[in-house]
């Protein structure tokens, strides 16, 4: 894995106008006046998504190693293969000169830079109307998503940081040139900027019917996806004082509840659960980064990491197998059945239990969409947020509704009370392999027990990645490193 990196925040460069859904790559958008029509805007927006499909870089994106980041750092996954592609994550081997800390940093700021450039060119062109507002809302939501995930990787989580004045990330809310000297904003400013972008995205998209339509917005951040992200962000903030409030759980619950009650999505049925993972844009899917046979991260894809014939660097941990897969108490739970977690090997190599969430499409193991937001997560957000706002009855009902579609012969109403540990266990069962585990535990003040690093407490120095040294050097020390690196 050898990448050539330029200084972060100097990414306001040629902007690809590739429509990842149905067009071949065309000329770069390298002019300040390149976007002149709504069609130009459409293809430029698709160019932002393109950065996360493996076409710009095979490393560090949602459809590859970043999509498994919190799983590999957590308790429930282990590295079996010996290719050492993602051991900076799974074995806590990250350094300031390492490949993945640089790859994720580079790629996410490149994604933000593309979004910024498209927004600025659209405003400069004077484009207006509902279609333009829908695309602009999409861009604000994407920028919020990229900033949020950079904050999760490179800064401590708000609920475990010593203070919201602690270091957040560099915020890129406009196109920046090579003279820009990056400095890290506070955690407070970081999360307020993320929420401001989401509020703007939702305000722009809410009046526009097309942004509420599931079928016409597949592979794009629509109105519901922006709500889903805002719910997730507020859940991470818990009772931290941001935007003048500490009642973020109430806000998270309101957004999740709106999606559950009014959105065009429905929970996977028990009978369908094992078959949905080979499909795109299914009934639960709120937002996916799309891959195709042409646009995917190849051997650094979700499918290749989670297969014994691939890198086999994301198998189920022994503790997960013992706690759930082999535990008779979970024998009727479809999520840990042989249809979802299977013992496999590559001949005599890489024998372990593997998730079946990334089987590939059309016979290609590389081709798996990253399911960034699903309706199941909204039920789990609602349950956790309700529990934390003392509505324990509602919390139990959300878990009960989910279990009804996941456990054979389940009697509706069986779950009458839950603890926070019950909710976190439900998240481990439902969302494993989708990039949540370690962050879920840490933000709730709980340690993880990684198969290699063993106990990693919330707020530990190695819970985050180091800032790439090349970027610190370029800033002449203005960009500060995370402690411990």
Residue ranges and their predicted role:
Residues 1-18:
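Sec-dependent bacterial lipoprotein signal peptides
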Residues 84-154, 185, 200-207, 250, ...:
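Conserved, well-structured interaction surfaces
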Residues 3, 18-68, 256, 310-311, ...:
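Membrane-proximal, proline-rich intrinsically disordered regions
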């Amino acid at each position: 894995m050898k990448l050539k990196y330029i200084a972060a925040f100097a990414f306001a460069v040629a902007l690809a106008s590739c429509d990842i859904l149905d067009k071949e790559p065309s000329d770069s958008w390298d002019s300040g006046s390149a976007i002149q029509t709504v069609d130009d805007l459409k293809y430029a927006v698709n160019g932002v998504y393109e950065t996360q499909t493996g076409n710009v870089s095979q490393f560090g994106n949602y459809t590859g190693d970043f999509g498994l980041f919190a799983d590999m750092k957590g308790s429930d996954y282990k590295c079996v293969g010996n290719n050492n592609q993602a051991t900076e994550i799974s074995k806590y081997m990250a350094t300031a000169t390492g490949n993945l800390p640089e790859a994720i940093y580079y790629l996410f700021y490149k994604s933000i830079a593309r979004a910024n450039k498209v927004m600025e060119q659209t405003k400069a062109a004077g484009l207006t109307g509902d279609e333009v507002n829908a695309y602009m809302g999409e861009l604000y939501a994407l920028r919020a998503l990229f900033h949020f995930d950079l904050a999760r990787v490179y800064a401590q989580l708000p609920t475990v940081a010593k203070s919201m004045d602690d270091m957040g990330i560099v915020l890129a809310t406009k196109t920046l040139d090579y003279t820009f000297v990056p400095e890290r904003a506070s955690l407070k400013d970081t999360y307020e900027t993320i929420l401001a972008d989401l509020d703007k995205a939702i305000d722009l998209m809410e009046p526009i019917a097309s942004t509420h339509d599931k079928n016409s917005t597949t592979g794009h951040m629509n109105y519901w996806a922006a709500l889903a992200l805002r719910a997730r962000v507020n859940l991470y903030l818990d009772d931290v004082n941001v935007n003048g409030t500490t009642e973020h759980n109430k806000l998270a619950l309101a957004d999740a509840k709106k999606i559950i009650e009014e959105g065009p999505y429905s929970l996977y049925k028990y009978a369908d659960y094992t078959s949905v993972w080979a499909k795109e844009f299914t009934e639960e899917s709120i937002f996916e980064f799309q891959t195709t046979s042409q646009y995917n991260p190849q051997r650094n894809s979700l499918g290749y990491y989670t297969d014994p014939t691939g890198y086999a660097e994301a198998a189920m941990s022994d503790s997960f197998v013992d706690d759930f897969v082999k535990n008779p108490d979970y024998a009727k739970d479809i999520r840990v059945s042989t249809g979802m977690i299977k013992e496999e090997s590559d001949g005599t190599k890489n024998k372990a239990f593997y998730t079946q969430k990334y089987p590939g499409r059309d016979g290609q193991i590389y081709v798996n969409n990253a399911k960034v937001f699903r309706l199941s997560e909204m039920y789990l957000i609602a349950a956790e947020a309700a529990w934390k706002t003392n509505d324990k009855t509602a919390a139990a009902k959300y878990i009960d509704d989910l279990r009804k579609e996941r456990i054979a012969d389940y009697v509706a109403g069986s779950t009458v009370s839950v603890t926070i540990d019950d909710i976190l266990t439900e998240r481990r069962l439902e969302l494993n392999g989708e990039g949540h585990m370690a962050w879920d535990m840490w933000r709730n003040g709980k340690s993880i027990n990684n198969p290699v690093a063993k106990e990693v407490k919330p707020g530990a120095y190695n819970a985050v990645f180091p800032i790439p040294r090349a970027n610190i050097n370029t800033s002449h020390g203005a960009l500060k490193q995370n402690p411990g690196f």
